[in-house]
Every structure is written in C-alpha cells, then in structure tokens.
Amino acid sequence: MKRTLLCCLTLLSCPFLYADEDTQLRLNQSLDQTLLQEQRQFHEQGTIRSTEQLPKLQINGQEYSVEQNPNDLAKALYLAVMQKQWLKATVYLEHYKKYVGYDRALTDFAEGAVARSQGQLKLAEQKFQSSLKQQPHNLICELELARVLFEQQKNKEAARLFISIQDQLKQSDPAVIPSGVLTTVNTIVQALKKRDSWQGSVSAGYTYVSNLNSSSEQSKTWTLYGRDSEGNMIPVREVTRGTPKAESAIGLDYEASLIKRYAIEGHHGVALRALAFGQSYNDHATFNESTININAGYSYFDLKNQIGVSPLFEHKRYGNDGLYNAWGARAEWMHFISADKAFKLEAESKDLNYQKYKTLDGVESSAFATFWKIFPDQWTFFGGLDVLDHSTQEKYMAAYQQQGVRLGLSKSWSTGFNTTLLSSYRWRLFDKYAETFLARRHDFEQNHTFVVQMPRFEFYGMTPNLTYRYNHNKSNVDWLYSYDKHNISFKLEHRF
C-alpha cells in the first residue's frame, strides 16, 4: 500500500498529465493560421441604388453615353460587368429587363456577376448555371462559374470546370480572350491542387531543458503529535518530505503536423489531421516523452465556414513505455468573418485508458475558442479561451477542472524572419481535499513561447527554427508542485 501511494505521488508530481497542451495548441494554431492566410479576399461590397437616368459608361478613362434602347443597354450591361462597374451595371440591368425579348442569358450572367461582387455566392452560382443552360459553352460565363465554385470551396466541381476551361483557352483566339486569362486559370488550378494536397510540416533538432524533472527543489516538515500518559498532546517526531534536485538535459526535440482533405461533392468532404511531437534524452531516458494525435472524419467547407466532426485517437508514451491510449470524438467550426478576421470553436472528449496506472483512467473533455486578426504589414494577433474537465477514478490528486487564456502575436519580417510569441495562463483546481497534503490543491500555470523561423537561411527545403519556452507553475502545495522550467531548442523544419 505504501509503495502504491509513493508511486502515485511520484507519478502525479510529473507534469506530463497536462504539460504538452501548449505544443499541441501551437501546432494546431499554425495549421489554422495557414488556412486563414490562404483565404481569398472577397470582392468589395457596395450599396446598389437605382436611378432613372442612365449613367455614362467609362472605359479606359473615356466616357460613353448610353442610349435608351435594347442594343445600347445590352452592350453597356456586358461592358459594365466586365469592367466591374457594379453600380452602373445594376442600373443598365434594370432598364434592359423592361424590354420585351431581352437576352435572358445576358441578364442571368450580369445578375450572377453582381451577386458575386456582393459575396452572395450561392445566388451567383445559380445565375451563372441558368445563363449557361440558355447559352452553353459561353467561356466567360464558365470562367465566372468556376471562380464562384472555387470561392465556395467546391473543389471537385471547380477543378473539373477549370481544367475544361484550360483546354478551351489553349485553342482560343487571343484577340477574343486575353492570354492573361489563361495565366490566371493556371494559377487557380495550381491553388486547387494545393488545397486538396497533403500539407503540413516536420521538424527535428536539439533541445536543452533546465528542469527536466519539474522539481520544486523544496522540502516541507510535518510534526506528528501523540498523547502522553496524562493525555496531553506532545510532539512525537518530525517527518520531512522534499523533491530532488532539478536535472538539466540535452536531447532530441521533434514535431510533425499533417492535414489532408478529400473533396467528395459540393461542400462535403473527408478531412484528416495528425500531430506528433516529443522529446528524447540519451542520459535521461526515463523522461522521454512522445504523443500522437489523429482525427479523421466528415468535413464541410464553404466560403465563410469550415466544419469538422470526427473520431480521434491519441497515444502517449513516457519513459519509453506506453502511458495511455485514448479514443474520443472531436468537433470544430471555423468561421471566416472577413478576409482578415476568423473565429474558431473546438470541442473534444476522450476516454483515457492508462496501461499501468489504472486509477488514472477517466474522461477528459475540453472546449476552445480562438480569434485571429490580420493587421497590415503581416502582423497577426490571436487569442482564445479554453476550459477542460479531467476526471479520473482517483478523485483526490489527479481529477481537476481547468480554465485558460491564450494570447499570441506573429509577424513575417521583410528581412527573411518569421516570429511568433505565444503566452498561455491556466488555473487548475483539483476535485477534492487531499489529506496527504492537508489541502485542496490549486495551481496557476503560465507558459511563454517565442519562435523564430529563418526562411532566409533555408537550404534544401529546410528552414532553421529556434524556439524558447518558459514554464512556471505556482501551487498551494508549493513544496511538491511549484517549479520553473526553461527550454530552448534549435530545429530544422520542412513545410509542404
């Protein structure tokens, strides 16, 4: 019994129960920020008003009067759409539709273009498809429809149409279709291939840790009392408990992240996301640590939203032995508020099955909210809140609730460096009062991570990456759980 309690205390004093949260959050944050930066800017929206007087059409700085007849209005409407003069196009459209026998293919095309300019992509898609039904093989209309499909993340349909357009453009008359259009189409086709390709990163390098065993380097003494022959309380003996000296070590630090989405039809698809990270120390193998987290399931993408629901699996090793396996479920929703702002909600629950320490078996449920804002000059701010409930069979020293705040700032510098600063603050309250500590444990943990990527020194596809992390934990059970830790690593990273 005493040995079991001692092992349990030793185990619970190790930070692996919650210390890798920042690494996992940082890797996910990097993937999500990449998605945000890849989003295309929407067309500028404007208020459309009608007028009885026909505005003059402006082309290449010259103004042309438009007469009130169907021929003039049809030409002016088409040219206004192609010149992206949306207010004028709307006026021409209104007047043109008053004439009997107007060209429905033209008006549907114009209405689709105006709808696209306002961000109404579903309506734009319907109008372009209607126009093509009346006038099949209209290359300009096909091109606009393909763009709308691309912007709505309907990757499979967009790719099919763009490839067809590519073939037509190669055989078209440059006098009718400018050669620059083919260049644009080629660029979008490449973007579609990248969007549906495997993306991620892998990095490895050396790391130095100043307090590998997360020791407080403190001790505490208790006085045990008993009663004498007369029944009075007297001190019997003193018991001192303490933590070992902090150990430093040099080892291998490695990380990998991977995402892949398979478009099935329309907005629907299947997505995979996998993370792997850990550290290995030659002279301190008992502190080796690694984690693999995989989730794959249903994915919905459109212009403004990305939704995913999937099962997940996580495997963690500690000291070269399997620590636990976990199965669970994950749901996420990322909303692109505008071209420079995004918001994400995540929730997951996993059933932890420890291979040796069965009293730690339980369910961990968590929820995260994150906001991104891109500023001029390639500054990006992100921040978030998180809550977590970690329940275990052992209710006194391992089960807890946690609330956290995250703040971060990243910047791409013109000198060929990228920097990211991430800080997290967590408040952890354990479930019950523990007689062992004569306290109900509560911790305040803070982590500060600074990452410098050096693309200017890239060679053979490898980018140098320097990461510094400071971890501070303050506990009311100070002698056992309070500690400071510094970690610095230098890795080579390959992104694909």
From Swiss-Prot:
InterPro entries: Slam_C_b-barrel, TPR-like_helical_dom_sf
Pfam family of the protein (one): TPR_Slam
Protein location: Cell outer membrane
Disruption phenotype: Knockout of the gene abrogates HphA secretion. In a mouse pulmonary infection model, the mutant shows a small decrease in bacterial lung burden and systemic spread.
Induction: Part of the hemO gene cluster.
Membrane topology annotation: Multi-pass membrane protein
Signal peptide as annotated in the record: 1-19
Main subcellular location of this protein, as a coarse class: membrane
Keyword tags: Cell outer membrane, Membrane, Signal, Transmembrane, Transmembrane beta strand, Virulence
Membrane-spanning residues: 198-208, 253-263, 268-277, 291-301, 305-315, 327-337, 341-351, 365-374, 380-389, 403-413, 418-427, 446-455, 462-472, 486-495
One of the record's GO cellular component terms: cell outer membrane
Family, as annotated: Belongs to the Slam family.
Protein name: Hemophilin secretion modulator
Species annotation: Acinetobacter baumannii
Gene: hsmA
